[in-house]
Amino acid sequence: MVSKPRNEWSTALSHLVLAGVSLHAAVSSVQSSRGAAAGFLLQTLAAVIMLAPELNTHEDCLAGAWVATVIGLPLLAFDFHWVNGDRSSANLLLGGGMVLAVAGDHLGPEGCSVAGQAVLLVVAVTILIVAVFTANTYGMWGGAMLGVAGLLSRLEEDRLLLLPKEDVCRWALAAGSWAYCRALHTQRLQWE
């Protein structure tokens, strides 16, 4: 059994790493990819808000995570598709995320959970497909890690690798965000 203080440190560290990686990715990509930078910034803000729960209610923290998932992740994929000429997929992902963000109050907790995981997996798969066709190795890793985060969140287990499941998902999301930031940079270099 893992002690409660260790769980708190693990949770805080996973939020800090996700916030740090996402902030670095936002700053790195702001000049070349404003949509992706906005998506990374939403991830950063959601992770930081979760670190200071005394400033907000639990519902505010969940709302921030919801927005980072259903708007932030499609923003990340939007630019990846747009630059490769797949404008219809880019618009469909972003439009679907916006509709889900507005409909979040009507879905209920279970519906929001399923919709958030679906958005994560759809974004991961579409990034992976584009990365395979463009031979972007970082994009493949980013899509795979985002997919791992989505699949791990569906597991029934409370703990994975001696850590709380949510922490492992945040670590996978941070790794996917880092790889995706590198993929955007690689993609921009190929097009210039």
Swiss-Prot record:
> Principal localization?
membrane
The places in or outside the cell where this protein is found are: Membrane
Looking at the UniProt entry, the stretches that span the membrane are: 35-55, 63-83, 92-112, 114-134
Q: Which UniProt keywords apply?
A: Membrane, Signal, Transmembrane, Transmembrane helix
Leader sequence residues: 1-32
Report the domain of life of the source organism. Answer: Eukaryota
The way this protein sits in the membrane is described as: Multi-pass membrane protein
A GO cellular component annotation here is:
membrane
Protein name stated in the entry: Transmembrane protein 276
* Species this protein is from: Rattus norvegicus (Rat)
